[in-house]
Amino acid sequence: MLKIILPTIMLLPTALLSPAKSMWTNTTMYSLLIASISLHWLTPSYYPTKTLTLWTGMDQISTPLLVLSCWFLPLMIMASQGHLQHEPHKRKRMFISTLIIIQPFIILAFSATELMLFYISFEATLIPTLILITRWGNQPERLSAGIYLLFYTLISSLPLLVSILYLHTNTGTLHLPIIKLTHPNLPASWTSLLSSLALLMAFMVKAPLYGLHLWLPKAHVEAPIAGSMLLAALLLKLGGYGIMRVTLLMEPVSNFLHYPFLTLALWGALMTSSICLRQTDLKSLIAYSSVSHMGLVIAASMIQTQWSFSGAMILMISHGLTSSLLFCLANTNYERTHSRILILTRGLQPLLPLMSVWWLLANLTNMALPPTTNLMAELTIMVALFNWSSPTIILTGTATLLTASYTLYMLLSTQRGTLPSHITTTPNSNTREHLLMTLHIIPMLTLILKPELISGTPL
């Protein structure tokens, strides 16, 4: 565990002390090295928990997310080079340092076996994200987006702290393996019901559940590209991961608590997919599609069967890769046309023909075309939901149909059509951007061959 955390922390002096010329190269290469070392976590082990220390441990649920978070640091650094090139050197250092500071906290959050440590690292990721959005966003609205992000997350996570303390007074420990072994039965009272609700609520806002999702499109639209990638690929997954961890602790008080959340998540998947069909802003469209996919993850985590957990796990990883790739593609368009409006950036296929290949691949994975892992995940979740209650197939089926519709709408409106007259000169796509897209696509394609690496089954 430490052989990843310590080098990640040492990236900070690397970024601060590197000479101006080689700063980007040093940080990117070093973080890629850390990412490739982290791949060995995926080796299957006989024991349910790998590398168990007093405060961290990894099992089937956290390992894929940990590898994903290590994989995304070099990608975020690579994606940010374009829009930071005109900034003073000191600000570039600050930007890279902010990205690096988030990383140990995310790794701690995914590997913590102690609920209090999990809470602290869960909250600590918020501040650097806020700095990224409010300092490096493009429009003045970034300040209101930052306030939305801060208040939604803080208001929901204060009750989480209280309910963790309540759990501690009742069980005497917050160590997850011990809690799992002892199966503490909380007394069936109003306080335990409220505390289980508070435990769930913080993660529902982070995931986000439909109705509590208003901070997400704002944050995505106003964030710089690294902020969008971080939110889509890692911070939303903290919500899904927290739900998976916490639902196993709250039996049997909260069983009937799951019904409203399940219904709302599935209804939200349907509603946000239909909202996507009416979007004019490209980044906003991708952000709403994230809400729709995470709705399925929440619904699956609420059922708590092996199949549904497995489906939720695969969907979280594949959605992280897909939506991050879509944000990168949207950013390459934005850097050339300086507009996110779909009508003003249409018909780019003749100008950037190779980029349209990436657009096609990203959109096909987003609409869960076979044989992608997105399809495996959606099928697994649908089967689990159908097994639990057959009418859910109406909601999930319609949501899938709408997903395909808005994905095709996004592809056709960005790539096809007549070129707007105001786009006169477009810089060519460069190697860095193609490498960035390739490093998103390679994990997607390799996971098709071996999806059991990410189909975490809670042991």
Curated annotation (Swiss-Prot):
Primary location class = mitochondrion
Task: Mention one GO molecular function.
Answer: ubiquinone binding
Which EC number(s) does the record attach to this protein? 7.1.1.2
Record-linked InterPro entries: NADH4_N (IPR000260), NADH_Q_OxRdtase_chainM/4 (IPR010227), NADH_UbQ_OxRdtase (IPR003918), ND/Mrp_TM (IPR001750)
Listed under GO cellular component are: mitochondrial inner membrane; respiratory chain complex I
Topology relative to the membrane? Multi-pass membrane protein
Keywords from UniProt, A to Z, are: Electron transport, Membrane, Mitochondrion, Mitochondrion inner membrane, NAD, Respiratory chain, Translocase, Transmembrane, Transmembrane helix, Transport, Ubiquinone
| Transmembrane feature ranges | 28-48, 60-80, 100-120, 147-167, 197-217, 224-244, 256-276, 285-305, 309-329, 341-361, 384-406
- Per the UniProt entry, what is one GO biological process? mitochondrial respiratory chain complex I assembly
Q: Where in the cell is it found?
A: Mitochondrion inner membrane
Question: EC top class, in one word?
Answer: translocase
**Which reaction is this enzyme known to catalyze?**
a ubiquinone + NADH + 5 H(+)(in) = a ubiquinol + NAD(+) + 4 H(+)(out)
Q: Which PANTHER family match?
A: NADH-UBIQUINONE OXIDOREDUCTASE CHAIN 4
Assembly and partners are described as: Core subunit of respiratory chain NADH dehydrogenase (Complex I) which is composed of 45 different subunits.
Q: What does this protein do?
A: Core subunit of the mitochondrial membrane respiratory chain NADH dehydrogenase (Complex I) which catalyzes electron transfer from NADH through the respiratory chain, using ubiquinone as an electron acceptor. Essential for the catalytic activity and assembly of complex I.
Q: Which family does it belong to?
A: Belongs to the complex I subunit 4 family.
Protein name as it appears in the record: NADH-ubiquinone oxidoreductase chain 4
Species lineage, top-down?
A: Eukaryota, Metazoa, Chordata, Craniata, Vertebrata
